[in-house]
Amino acid sequence: MDRTLIQEILEIVEQAAIASATLSGKGLKDEADALAVDAMRKRMNQIQMKGRIVIGEGERDEAPMLYIGEEVGTGTGPGVDFAVDPCEGTNLCAYSQRGSMAVLAASDRGGLFNAPDFYMKKLAAPPAAKGKVDIRKSATENIKILSECLGLAPDELTIVVMDRARHKDLITEIRATGARIQPISDGDVQAAIACGFAGTGTHCLMGIGAAPEGVISAAAMRALGGHFQGQLVYDPAIAQTSEWADMTKEGNLARLAEMGITDPDKVYEASELACGEHVVFAGSGITDGLLFNGVKFETDCTRTSSLIISNLNNTCSFTNTIHMKDGAQSIALN
């Protein structure tokens, strides 16, 4: 992937963010997601590449666009695999809450783990703690290690955890160490990536979230040099979600076996979830969040705030883009 393609990848998430932001705060999460999907696919199909969706909106019979296995792009040029979430945090967008964004990971062919639509136990931490914290250790042990790596007392650490019933015991354990909890209602990708940057006030992400988003987070953290591990969750008793009300542990294990996953308890490192030679992460804010602002609509323009990370040349770019409207008369700098 060259610099031109990386710029075009940035434009993919910008267009998706703008599209879904038109419905931000209107309580229409499915409609906002559909607009983002359409905008993302439209921009992808304008790019000279042989693109393929490996993580998308669902299986081919479940999603009309950006389904798993769908080919995107013009059909000529480099082969690129994509893991996409056109509107991460649909509820956040629908109710104009912080943290919704359009996001994707891209890599050369075969460079992204084809994660099943399961849940995943995740651990994200700053580069200083890479390889020292471990998802197999208790939260108490990891907070002690994190404290030593960052030179901060436990009560100076902030741990992000999704606000779910399944995390009740985890939250109790974290609080017993003295560390602070920052609960989030949806969308853990931005929280995971924030752990890779100093000064965000976010030091660690713990808990269970969606597996596909784990791959996207891993791509970003690999490029940042941060720590990310994931472990698939297949037991409904652990996931504790109504979405799995009709599923069984045995049935989920059988499904994983059908997908070729022979070790369902394997702990995946970031370099295994995003193993490509060249890995790119791109995200654009729909609503304001930890890392960037959301879309701003003005009289003569629309403003987007985005982030793109590439391991090709170890770059991380925060980009504020002004999308001028036809006939624009005056554009303010800020």
UniProtKB/Swiss-Prot annotation:
Tell me its family.
Answer: Belongs to the FBPase class 2 family.
Which BP terms does GO give this entry? fructose 1,6-bisphosphate metabolic process; gluconeogenesis; glycerol metabolic process; reductive pentose-phosphate cycle
- Read off the PANTHER family from this record: FRUCTOSE-1,6-BISPHOSPHATASE 1 CLASS 2-RELATED, FRUCTOSE-1,6-BISPHOSPHATASE CLASS 2
The cross-references to Pfam families, in alphabetical order and at most eight, read: FBPase_glpX (PF03320)
Oligomeric form and interacting partners? Homotetramer.
| Name of the protein in its database record | D-fructose 1,6-bisphosphatase class 2/sedoheptulose 1,7-bisphosphatase
- For the ligand (Mn(2+) 1), the binding residues are D33, E57
Explain the purpose of this protein.
Catalyzes the hydrolysis of fructose 1,6-bisphosphate (Fru 1,6-P2) and sedoheptulose 1,7-bisphosphate (Sed 1,7-P2) to fructose 6-phosphate and sedoheptulose 7-phosphate, respectively.
Cofactor(s) required, per the database record: Mn(2+)
**InterPro entries from the xrefs?**
FBPase_class-2/SBPase (IPR004464)
The residues that the entry says bind substrate are E88, G89, T90, Y119, R164, A165, R166, D186, G187, D188
| Organism field | Synechococcus sp. (strain CC9311)
Its cellular-component GO annotations read: cytosol
Q: In which pathway does it act?
A: Carbohydrate biosynthesis; Calvin cycle
